[in-house]
From Swiss-Prot:
Protein's name in the database: Replication protein E1
Reactions catalysed according to its record: Couples ATP hydrolysis with the unwinding of duplex DNA by translocating in the 3'-5' direction; ATP + H2O = ADP + phosphate + H(+)
Protein's organism: Human papillomavirus 69
Motif (Nuclear localization signal): 84-86
Function: ATP-dependent DNA 3'-5' helicase required for initiation of viral DNA replication. It forms a complex with the viral E2 protein. The E1-E2 complex binds to the replication origin which contains binding sites for both proteins. During the initial step, a dimer of E1 interacts with a dimer of protein E2 leading to a complex that binds the viral origin of replication with high specificity. Then, a second dimer of E1 displaces the E2 dimer in an ATP-dependent manner to form the E1 tetramer.
Localisation: Host nucleus
UniProt biased composition (Polar residues): 91-115
Binding of ATP, residues: 463-470
Molecular function GO labels: ATP binding; ATP hydrolysis activity; DNA binding; DNA helicase activity
Annotated region (DNA-binding region), positions in chain: 172-338
Family: Belongs to the papillomaviridae E1 protein family.
Amino acid sequence: MDCEGTDGEGLGCTGWFSVEAIVEKHTGETISEDEIEYSSDTGSDLIGFIDDSNISDGAEQQVAQALFQAQETQANKKAVRALKRKLLGSQNSPLQDITNQSNSQQSTDEVNNLQAKRRAVDSVPDSGYGYTEVETLTPVQVDKHNEQNGDSVCSQGGSSGSVSDMEVDIGAQASSVTKICELLKCSNVKAALLSKFKTVYGVSYTELVRVFKSDKTCCSDWVCAAFGVAGSVAESLKTLIQPYCLYYHIQCLTCNWGVLPLMLIRFTCAKNRATIKKCLCTLLNVPDTQLLIEPPKLRSTAVALYFYKTGLSNISETHGDTPEWIVRQTQLEHSFEDTIFDLSKMVQWAFDHDITDDSEIAFKYAQLADIESNAAAFLKSNCQAKYVKDCATMTRHYKRAQKRSMGMSQWLQHRCSKIEDGGTWKDIARFLRYQNVNFIYFLQVLKQFLKGTPKHNCIVIYGPPNTGKSQFAMSFIKFVQGSVISYVNSNSHFWLQPLEDAKVALLDDATYGCWLYIDKYLRNFLDGNPCCIDRKHRSLIQVRCPPLIITSNINPQDDNSLMYLHSRVTVIPFPNTFPFDSNGNPVYELTDVNWKSFFSTTWSRLDLEEDADKENGEPLPAFKCVPGENTRLL
């Protein structure tokens, strides 16, 4: 600001002398020794050189007031800075980081302060509960301001005293949010969450849960912990979570981060961690980084007792029926039910469900541990692999003995009992008619085939490719649960071993080389006479060859080199291509239900025997390998 009577700084020292003269006159400063040296100079030669006619007393006073105001402003800033260091330097203050800044960064631009405020406000998410921006703005603004400008908050405009008071009050309310913001700066957020959980609840979170590495693994029971939840939101969670679950156990404790709820939730259906994160983030209004979600340890008695005892306290809120894994490990009557493992019960289960594969037995029986005490004892055993192998071996023995004890009529009746009703035999009859096969002729051939009549023990279905030969034969073999042999294994001595336990067998797609092999080695097989079969790691066994179906593109009766097979096979030609509709579905459905309907309709035509000894509609009495139990009390 130029003083009155001065047009500008000008050239040389003209402007300086004009200001200095006024300041010297009114401030009473001591004259320097350099100026005393020229005190003898009267300045008569400079009379009239400076025109001070325009300088008035008002201009002199204005300059003095401006200087005084600048000095007072600087003194006030120093006083405010000293006061803030005194009041905000305690350990419990959320704004204590201000005192760590350097004094060399005290000048602040007003525009930068406003931009820093805007960034701080925009970075705070609105929770929808109260004045979130007001509660979180001040601590964030202090950190941002200290990092960029180094000045105190009180120098950012307005009354310094009122701003300082507001920061202290709001900072006390927003301390929990400040702690959460500090959490995001941690190098290992999960470790910080686990540490805080153990500090608040006195128990390690990892002791309550088992770890799922994948977020896509589904489970019905989950243990969830949330950090930095508002008190009103935590209270309303007990109502908001009910539509999503069958049971919940919620306990809430407070810390300097806010409310920390611990939840054991059984959802209405199995959910994965990613789905639960989305649900809880919506209900609790917290980011997923502030959530711990893992399934509980279902077989840990300590975990069951923890949730059982805390459920009885006044800090917990429960809803719904208690999960069975807690009841089983905490109530006395259920503890009596824990017995040692019984292999016979496992074998009975595998036999009833017709499961003979080791892996399938292990997987499906382990899934019954929640509802079956013997399965739970199986999981607790250290010999699970041995039990699975023994169970599969015994099941196969029982199944093999059961099949051998049945005749063909009993076996077909047994297979029909395993299949639901609702099929139609007409699809099979129409398909045979489509292939120009007389239905009555087919029934006569099938009757002799099922009885194993010599010279009629083998049916050959031949024709061009894509005529449905394999489809027809495979559907029949699947219904009667027969065995399939492949000529590709003919170099092995054991390739005929599946015929040992088969009621009906199939050799699919026999080539000319296969027919030569049959003509050379398997003539007695086609006759249905007893023969000897080599078995791997076991001695030879003498069996009667079961009825055999062969599909081929070659008609053996047309080849004179196979003349010894002409009387041993019954040939049925399939000349027409298998039909499909416009959607690619087969026109004739060759399914198990249709084959059941076929045999039920043609039972008397096929001369199959009725079981006169059957009871309650069952061809054989139910197999039972579990000893009976006396339920009477002493």
